[in-house]
């Protein structure tokens, strides 16, 4: 039977790895199928190329996972015995049980016992073989049978399986294992059994009436399913070896000049090797499944530890990178601004709030801002430091800078006033009475107490005409303020520029409204 599948040019399908090459070499047509001017990948599936080459038989995937030969052979024997016992309880025909065991042997020559559960694959092979041989069984029955076999093997009282979440998970695992078997075998699940061949050969030898000989040869053939002879030799050679072994056991003479099996295409070397493999089963000790499962678990843990050690997850092992710096960037010693110009970096939100609250509390509790000269200089230096650390959005607008520079109060005064203006919080505008020195002095304390409770001003932007009028007012009143005492001048410097300017402006423009009515 040949099948061609479309795919990449010149590539072999990976699913044919389990049955791609046999003793006769590569099958013709496996290099591809030429359709028109394109070459499509081809898979030639025959009963001859289902045999495994010697290199796969000598070094199996289980050996690469760390299992020794005896442990792997014991697992193969136990798995085939489970399939045979489950088939008997499920009342499957012998052909279906033989198909399940052959599929089991083929699968574990492509996969490891360490990575795949032997019991789950056995259940999947029984369920798959029952459908292949047209004697299907429900997967629930297969699970119940294997559950009973496990309790009998452990010498426990059989208990019905509870239909809980564990049962659902087991059912899903068996379905996945069945799909995995089909994928690894390339859906080449047809098995040619030697049962009918034995009867046909005995008819040729005129020994079909000897029921004892027929039954003994049949028994040897069923026992040979636990070995690897079905993946190494043709069914005709296996049938001849079973007849030869049964005749030698029952001491029934058969033609030997020439040997009778040469008529059916078998060789003497193949007959001897098959007989040796079958007789080895009867000399082996009874397999302890618990010991085999413990060996498999040890190999699993060893592989997991090796993987974790390679990734650096275990304590005392170094990760793939030398240090944690490979996962996160190293901390910077200084900010970019400090490295470039030596200027301090802008403070964080909490530190900026603390710096703002300090001057506010001092101004709110001091009567008429009557601070000493040392305290005045400290507050001025603090306001300057805060104005330097402010972001550009909090500084004065260009128009206000222009008006400050145009004033006659001097460059140093305007510079200090602009800095203190940027640091002062916004105020709500109130309309007051015309300016009177005595009233301002008397009500200054009440104004400072109300300062913290006032709502912020909605907008800081003012028109250029207002700034020009303010500058004119400052120049007109400069002479008037100079006549006052130095004590009042120091107080005026300490107060924020915006507060005094807004008070003068609205008190002069709107004489009918006063902030403190009497």
Swiss-Prot record:
Keywords: Cyclin, Nucleus, Phosphoprotein, Repeat, Transcription, Transcription regulation. InterPro entries: Cyclin-like_dom, Cyclin-like_sf, Cyclin/Ssn8, Cyclin_C-dom, Cyclin_N. Residues 81-183 are annotated as: Cyclin-like 1. One of its GO terms (cellular component) is nucleus. The keyword Protein biosynthesis does not apply. Residues 382-420 are annotated as: RS. Residues 455-469 have a biased composition (Basic residues). GO terms for molecular function: cyclin-dependent protein serine/threonine kinase regulator activity. It is found in: Nucleus speckle; Nucleus, Nucleoplasm. The keyword Phosphoprotein applies. Residues 196-280 are annotated as: Cyclin-like 2. Residues 310-518 are annotated as: Disordered. One of its GO terms (biological process) is regulation of RNA splicing. Residues 405-427 have a biased composition (Low complexity). Residues 438-450, 470-479, 487-512 have a biased composition (Basic and acidic residues). The modification Phosphoserine is found at residues 328, 335, 345, 348, 366. Widely expressed (at protein level). Contains a RS region (arginine-serine dipeptide repeat) within the C-terminal domain which is the hallmark of the SR family of splicing factors. This region probably plays a role in protein-protein interactions. Involved in pre-mRNA splicing. May induce cell death, possibly by acting on the transcription and RNA processing of apoptosis-related factors. Interacts with CDK11A, CDK11B, CDK12, CDK13 and POLR2A, the hyperphosphorylated C-terminal domain (CTD) of RNA polymerase II. May form a ternary complex with CDK11B and casein kinase II (CKII). Interacts with pre-mRNA-splicing factors, including at least SRSF1, SRSF2 and SRSF7/SLU7. Belongs to the cyclin family. Cyclin L subfamily. This is Cyclin-L2. It comes from Mus musculus (Mouse). The lineage of its organism: Eukaryota, Metazoa, Chordata, Craniata, Vertebrata.
């Amino acid at each position: 039977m040949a099948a061609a599948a479309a795919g990449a040019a010149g590539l072999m399908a990976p699913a044919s790895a389990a049955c791609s090459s046999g003793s006769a070499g590569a099958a013709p047509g496996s290099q591809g199928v030429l359709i028109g001017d394109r070459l499509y990948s081809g898979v030639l599936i025959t009963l001859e190329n289902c045999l495994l080459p010697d290199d796969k038989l000598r070094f199996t995937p289980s050996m690469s996972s760390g299992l020794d030969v005896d442990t792997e052979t014991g697992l193969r024997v136990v798995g085939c015995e489970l399939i045979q016992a489950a088939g008997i309880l499920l009342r499957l025909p012998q052909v279906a049980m033989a198909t399940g065991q052959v599929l089991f042997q083929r699968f574990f020559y492509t996969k490891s016992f360490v990575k795949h559960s032997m019991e789950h694959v056995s259940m999947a092979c029984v369920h798959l073989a029952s459908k292949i041989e047209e004697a299907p069984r429900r997967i629930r029955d297969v699970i119940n049978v294997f559950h009973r076999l496990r309790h009998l093997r452990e010498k426990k009282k059989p208990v019905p399986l509870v239909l809980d979440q564990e049962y659902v998970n087991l059912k899903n695992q068996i379905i996945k294992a069945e799909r995995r078997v089909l994928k690894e075998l390339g859906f080449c699940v047809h098995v040619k059994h030697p049962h009918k061949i034995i009867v046909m050969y005995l008819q040729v030898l005129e020994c079909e009436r000897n029921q004892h000989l027929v039954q003994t040869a049949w028994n040897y053939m069923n026992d040979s399913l636990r070995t690897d002879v079905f993946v190494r030799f043709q069914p005709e050679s296996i049938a001849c070896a079973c007849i030869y072994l049964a005749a030698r056991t029952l001491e029934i003479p058969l033609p030997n000049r020439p040997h009778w099996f040469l008529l059916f295409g078998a060789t003497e070397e193949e007959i001897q090797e098959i007989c040796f493999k079958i007789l080895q089963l009867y000399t082996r000790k009874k397999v302890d499944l618990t010991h085999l499962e413990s060996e498999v678990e040890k190999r699993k843990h060893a592989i997991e530890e090796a993987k974790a050690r390679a990734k650096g997850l275990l304590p005392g092992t170094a990760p793939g990178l030398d240090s944690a710096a490979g996962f996160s960037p190293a901390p910077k010693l200084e900010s970019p601004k400090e490295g470039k110009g030596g200027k301090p970096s802008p403070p964080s939100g909490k530190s900026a709030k603390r710096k703002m609250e300090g001057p506010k509390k001092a101004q709110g509790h001091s009567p008429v801002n009557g601070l000493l000269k040392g305290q005045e200089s400290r507050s001025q230096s603090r306001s300057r430091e805060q104005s330097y650390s402010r972001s550009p959005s909090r500084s004065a607008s260009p128009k206000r800078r222009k008006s400050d520079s145009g004033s006659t109060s001097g460059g140093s005064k305007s510079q200090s006033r602009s800095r203190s203006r940027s640091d002062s919080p916004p105020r709500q505008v109130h309309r007051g009475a015309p300016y009177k020195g005595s009233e301002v002095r008397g009500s200054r304390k009440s104004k400072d107490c109300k300062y913290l409770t006032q709502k912020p001003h909605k907008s800081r932007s003012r028109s250029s005409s207002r700034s020009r009028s303010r500058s004119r007012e400052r120049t007109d009143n400069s002479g008037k303020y100079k006549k006052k005492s130095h004590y009042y001048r120091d107080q005026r410097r300490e107060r924020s520029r915006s507060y005094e300017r807004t008070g003068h402006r609205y008190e002069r423009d709107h004489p009918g409204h006063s902030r403190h009515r009497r």
